[in-house]
């Protein structure tokens, strides 16, 4: 999530001509769409999940209109069960791949990474690797190709004596 926010912020800064936090950056003017910081609303009688779906629908409408947009989706479809989330996410990924659209999609669902095999020219798995050394997590903060193999949630839960 932090990395996605950094990319989104740098896009906005670059588009207004401000300095960015990067060694180099090349972009073309795009509208930025995200599902980050989506909120529910009791006043609108709108659940988090429905608010997220409305945002995704707005993205698809813009793509269908032929607009150039950059999409950032963070853990999409959080408001449903894991099977429905995976199926819906994969279908959305397939639909998005029909358009000329740059997107960053973050997920912790390892099955979603199979989309790279299905769409090898349009989907690329990237991750931040973590090592466990001397009972500590070591972060290298380097974007790597592939799917992370470190299971840090269980490690941290055990370390904090949660499980």
Locations of regions flagged by a protein language model:
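ATPase nucleotide-binding head domains, primarily ABC-like/P-loop NTPase cores
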Residues: 1-163
């Amino acid at each position: 999530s932090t990395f996605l926010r950094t990319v989104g912020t740098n896009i906005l800064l670059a588009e207004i001509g401000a300095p960015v936090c990067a060694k180099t950056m090349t972009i073309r003017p795009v509208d930025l769409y995200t599902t980050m910081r989506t909120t529910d609303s009791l006043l609108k009688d709108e659940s988090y999940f429905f608010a997220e779906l409305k945002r995704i629908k707005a993205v698809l409408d813009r793509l269908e209109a032929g607009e150039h947009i950059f999409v950032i989706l963070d853990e999409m479809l959080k408001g449903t069960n894991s099977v429905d989330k995976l199926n819906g996410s994969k279908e959305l990924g397939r639909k998005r791949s029909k358009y000329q659209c740059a997107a960053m999609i973050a997920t912790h669902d390892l099955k979603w990474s199979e989309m790279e095999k299905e769409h090898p020219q349009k989907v690329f798995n990237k991750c931040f690797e973590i090592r466990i050394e001397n009972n500590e997590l070591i972060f290298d903060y380097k974007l790597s190709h592939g799917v992370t193999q470190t299971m840090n949630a269980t490690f941290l839960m055990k370390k904090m004596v949660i499980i």
